[in-house]
């Protein structure tokens, strides 16, 4: 029987496809070995430059991955919602973290320790398949973000950050305009104007603190259409 360190953490692990195929003793060892990290909005949960301690997942909440240039310019380039893993590349290379992980709302992280991460990579085909899928997804996201931030209009940036290639869960996103602006690199006022325009076009509907996606393909078409170069 699994130890009750955290019912959400146990349920989260049991929902992972690679976890189900492990022997019971390995499952129990993993559940006992994970650690939890909590933070409020604005907290830096994990710091750039620290040695990576494991593979992380967002149990609840929302975080942004934020890098800082040598000139001190900060850039938030990806949001990670509840239910998703992140940091697999750094865990595989066992390097210093290249970005800060900052809570955009009250958040809880789960950490699978490096020792267990290595053990699973060495022994579990299903775990390695999950890692490959995760890395492929992140590569696609990174390429889309780079292209959009360099070449696209504010409307296309917002459409991209609402797209299914960045959010794989429910199509009712519990995402505030402030959070969306942080991720897209736009002011809250600009995001508000853009969302109103998308709503008028029938691509989204807006509720308090939530954006409902009505037309995934329409958002994708908008995000990938030829656009003007974004302002620096």
What are these regions (language model features)?
Residues 78-133, 140:
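Cyclic-nucleotide recognition modules
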Residues 1-41, 86, 90-91:
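Cyclic nucleotide-binding regulatory module and flanking cytosolic helices
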Residues 28-29, 45-49, 195:
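Short loop/turn motifs at secondary-structure junctions and domain boundaries
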Residues 18, 43-105:
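Cyclic nucleotide-binding regulatory domains
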Residues 104-105, 122-188:
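Polybasic "coupling" helices that flank or enter modular domains
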Residues 154, 162-232:
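Phosphate-/nucleic-acid-contacting segments
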């Amino acid at each position: 029987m699994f130890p009750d360190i955290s019912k959400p953490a146990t349920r989260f692990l049991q929902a992972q496809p690679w976890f189900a195929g492990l022997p019971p003793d390995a499952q129990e060892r993993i559940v006992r070995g994970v650690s939890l990290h909590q933070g409020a909005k604005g907290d830096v949960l994990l710091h750039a430059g620290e040695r990576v301690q494991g593979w992380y997942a967002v149990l609840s909440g929302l975080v942004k991955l934020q890098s800082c240039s040598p000139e001190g310019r900060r850039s938030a380039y990806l949001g990670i919602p509840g239910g998703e893993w992140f940091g697999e590349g750094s865990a595989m290379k066992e390097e210093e973290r290249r970005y800060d992980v900052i809570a955009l709302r009250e958040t809880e992280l789960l950490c699978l320790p490096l020792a267990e991460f290595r053990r699973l990579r060495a022994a579990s085909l299903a775990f390695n398949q999950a890692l490959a899928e995760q890395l492929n997804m992140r590569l696609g996201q990174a390429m889309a973000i780079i292209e959009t931030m360099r070449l696209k209009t504010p409307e296309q940036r917002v459409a991209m950050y609402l797209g299914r290639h960045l959010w794989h869960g429910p199509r009712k996103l519990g995402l505030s305009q402030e959070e969306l602006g942080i991720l897209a690199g736009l002011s809250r006022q600009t995001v508000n104007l853009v969302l109103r325009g998308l709503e008028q076009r029938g691509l989204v509907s807006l509720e308090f603190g939530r954006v409902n996606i009505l037309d995934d393909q329409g958002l994708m078409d908008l995000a990938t259409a030829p656009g003007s170069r974004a302002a620096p």
